[in-house]
């Protein structure tokens, strides 16, 4: 962040020069500075934040993690990054860990073998980001590991991540004040006292100051109480208050994050303001989501401070079904255009019952063959088995693909809003057998 750091120095020098050289000289120097700054050869590449997974149930989330930086890299005039740090997880006895995702990150090309409480960890996925300031390329990395079993086994207590070493890259990044490293565990837990919630987890490694906007769709907000959003972000500086977090167009804040200083080295879970060059922030968004909303938009912006967003998670009390279908055991007989098959309609990843009489339409290619309906209410996590005999028209070839679509009235439209609208289909290849002619 030497560009930001140098901007601060420059402004300070302008104040001093004003005492001796006058306002006209200031204007000329500032114009020259802006001109040179705009001509700087700069480009950036990263991996945009996108939906990783959606989890539905009586769930909530929290973070545990820590920075490797012993001080903020800007304006500290020395290297600040260690290779180990610890944090404490403290869930209640009624909280049951459902998911635990470890993210670690730092400056440079990447350290993809670290230790967590003495267990060697290698990533399931990796992310990268780079910025080019002529003549150097500044790289950054993040890694992801599903450590659900480890956290379920360990439970509450101290978690220590070690052997995260970015020392080979620290001299280069020190020149721009972007030398950092840190880690965080995103924990999704179940508690029977919670309402049915929808958790959306997004990740990548996307640089801000470009505005990062996430549009949440397929919602049906039944209750806006305790709605919240959180994120894991890297490389923020508390001394550069130029960032905002908005929900549905409204700038929001919390006791740890002023409206104009979102990325300020804070941890909303512990209340610490010494999470240097890293943010684990959680915001209540109750007042910005309305009952009955079917969509929402959140956005993060930074106008000067260089930030990387690694993870965004939202929790909303959105209650909708999620119909899926699977076909099994298709049987045919020789010289017949009838097919008998079993099917199962499920409502597993949902927060509401699936009503009876949900339509199921069968297609041969693009031609509608038949429509049937579920018989009973399917509870959350439940399923219903069915059987049907289809008569295939003579216009359909002997070899074709049979497609089943649940929540389809026969013209490609459904009768309900679902949590996920693109998982309603299942297809299998069918061969009709005809006796050879002699």
What are these language model-derived features?
Residues 1, 6, 35, 165-169, ...:
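Short regulatory "switch" loops immediately downstream of catalytic or recognition motifs
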Residues 1-47:
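Bacterial Sec-dependent N-terminal signal peptides
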Residues 3, 7, 112, 136, ...:
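First exposed extracellular module after export/assembly in secreted or surface-exposed proteins
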Residues 7, 14-22, 42, 261-268, ...:
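Short linear motifs in intrinsically disordered/low-complexity regions
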Residues 21, 45, 156, 248, ...:
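Feature targets compositionally biased, intrinsically disordered low-complexity regions
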Residues 45-333, 340, 344, 359, ...:
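Disulfide-rich extracellular domains of secreted proteins
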Residues 318-438:
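Extracellular/luminal regions of secreted and cell-surface proteins that mediate adhesion/ECM remodeling
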């Amino acid at each position: 962040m030497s560009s930001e750091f140098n901007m601060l120095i420059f402004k300070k020098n302008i104040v001093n020069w004003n005492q001796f050289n006058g306002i006209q000289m200031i204007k000329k120097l500032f114009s020259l500075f802006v001109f040179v700054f705009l001509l700087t050869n700069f480009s950036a590449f990263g991996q945009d934040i996108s939906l990783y997974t959606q989890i539905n149930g009586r769930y909530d989330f929290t973070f545990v993690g820590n920075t490797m930086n012993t001080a903020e890299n800007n304006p500290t005039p020395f290297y600040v990054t260690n290779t180990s740090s610890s944090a404490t997880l403290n869930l209640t006895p009624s909280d049951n860990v459902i998911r635990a995702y470890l993210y670690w990150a730092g400056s440079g090309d990447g350290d993809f073998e670290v230790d967590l409480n003495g267990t060697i960890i290698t990533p399931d996925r990796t992310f990268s980001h780079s910025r080019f300031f002529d003549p150097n390329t500044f790289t950054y990395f993040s890694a992801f590991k599903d450590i659900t079993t480890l956290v379920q086994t360990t439970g509450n207590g101290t978690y220590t991540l070690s052997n995260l070493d970015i020392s080979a890259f620290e001299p280069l990044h020190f020149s721009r004040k972007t030398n950092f490293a840190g880690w965080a565990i995103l924990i999704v837990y179940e508690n029977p006292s919670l309402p049915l919630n929808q958790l959306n987890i997004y990740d990548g490694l996307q640089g801000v100051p470009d505005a990062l906007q996430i549009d949440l769709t397929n919602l049906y907000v039944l209750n806006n109480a305790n709605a919240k959003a959180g994120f894991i972000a890297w490389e923020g500086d508390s001394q550069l208050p130029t960032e905002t977090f908005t929900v549905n167009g409204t700038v929001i804040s919390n006791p740890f994050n002023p409206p104009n200083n979102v990325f300020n080295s804070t941890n909303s879970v512990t209340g610490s303001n010494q999470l240097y060059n890293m943010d684990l922030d959680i915001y209540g968004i109750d007042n910005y989501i309305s009952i009955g909303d079917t969509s929402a938009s959140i956005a993060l912006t930074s106008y000067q401070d260089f930030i990387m967003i690694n993870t965004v998670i939202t929790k909303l009390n959105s209650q909708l079904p999620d119909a899926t279908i699977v076909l099994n055991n298709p049987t045919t007989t020789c010289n017949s255009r009838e097919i008998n098959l079993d099917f199962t309609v499920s409502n597993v990843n949902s927060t509401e019952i699936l009503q009876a009489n949900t339509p199921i339409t069968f297609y041969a290619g693009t031609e509608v063959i038949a429509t049937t309906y579920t018989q009973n209410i399917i509870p959350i996590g439940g399923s219903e088995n069915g059987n049907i005999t289809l008569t295939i028209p003579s216009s359909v070839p002997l070899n074709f693909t049979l497609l089943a679509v649940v929540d389809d009235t026969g013209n490609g439209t459904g009768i309900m809003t679902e949590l996920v609208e693109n998982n309603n289909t299942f297809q299998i290849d069918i061969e009709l057998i005809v006796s050879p002619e002699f």
